[in-house]
Amino acid sequence: MKGIVLAGGAGTRLHPITRGVSKQLLPVYDKPMIYYPISVLMLAGIQDILIISTPEDLPSFKRLLGDGSQFGIRLQYAKQPSPDGLAQAFIIGEEFIAGERCALVLGDNIYFGQSFGKQLREVASRNDGATVFGYQVVDAERFGVIEFDENFNALSIEEKPQKPKSDWAVTGLYFYDKDVVEMAKEIKPSERGELEITTLNEMYLAKGKLRVELLGRGFAWLDTGTHDSLIDASLFIHTIEKRQGFKVACLEEIAYQNQWLSREKLNELAEALNKTYYGQYLLKLAKES
């Protein structure tokens, strides 16, 4: 299975901070924002990942992440010249996807919850159809909203409705089968001129091939698109890490646990960062394992 991180956009809600740097390169406590969505794909067992961003920002992502080998993954990069909709990611990434199943995660979404890795691996093992993730919110009119029947089977998906039919929002994480590229090509631009991910999900729903995984009580799904939400996310990660002593979205740790990195390689990476708490954490991890 392949994975895509969509890290484009102008980040206008975060101006003036994002006038000189991509939103997804901003820090969320002790890591660049893009570490968090990459960690989700890695937890799902995905090693081949495409980073899509603007032509202006791609060089910065390449400087930060390189070819991904230090995280036990294989990274490629592609340009999105203009933000023409989330579903455009599959058309841009057609050559990368190469007829395989593919997951898409938005570059400004953070997920944290117990047993999330197990849930992701189960979803990634499905060969047919699409899977989206639902999360209960108090302001559903801001999101794509899922309507369910009494057995929690999806009936409809509506983008930012004035009168939501439920309080379950579609989060920025999607898994699709090998048909996704051809289906994305069938989408016609919406009134705002974009290839909408909601339309793609509706197409799978019409075929009876859309599943919804619910992220329940106690799970955290954080958006980082505003100044306040960026601070809230940083404080959340800070609290978890300081209280429990482990790191959230530590890519080297996930790679090591997945046996994508050897202990020797982990030590080497840690030594390069030994003047930081992050590097000390990696050294401790290698010694204790």
Swiss-Prot record:
State the free-text cofactor note: Binds 1 Mg(2+) ion per subunit.
Complex formation: Homotetramer.
What EC number(s) is this enzyme filed under?
2.7.7.24
Presence of the UniProt keyword Metal-binding in the record: yes
Keyword terms, alphabetized: Lipopolysaccharide biosynthesis, Magnesium, Metal-binding, Nucleotidyltransferase, Transferase
Is Oxidoreductase among the key words of this record? no
**What function does the entry list?**
Catalyzes the formation of dTDP-glucose, from dTTP and glucose 1-phosphate, as well as its pyrophosphorolysis.
Q: Catalysed reaction per UniProt? A: dTTP + alpha-D-glucose 1-phosphate + H(+) = dTDP-alpha-D-glucose + diphosphate
Name of the protein: Glucose-1-phosphate thymidylyltransferase
Return the similarity comment.
Belongs to the glucose-1-phosphate thymidylyltransferase family.
Query: What's an example of a GO molecular-function annotation for this chain?
Result: metal ion binding
Query: In what pathway does it function?
Result: Nucleotide-sugar biosynthesis; dTDP-6-deoxy-L-altrose biosynthesis; Bacterial outer membrane biogenesis; LPS O-antigen biosynthesis
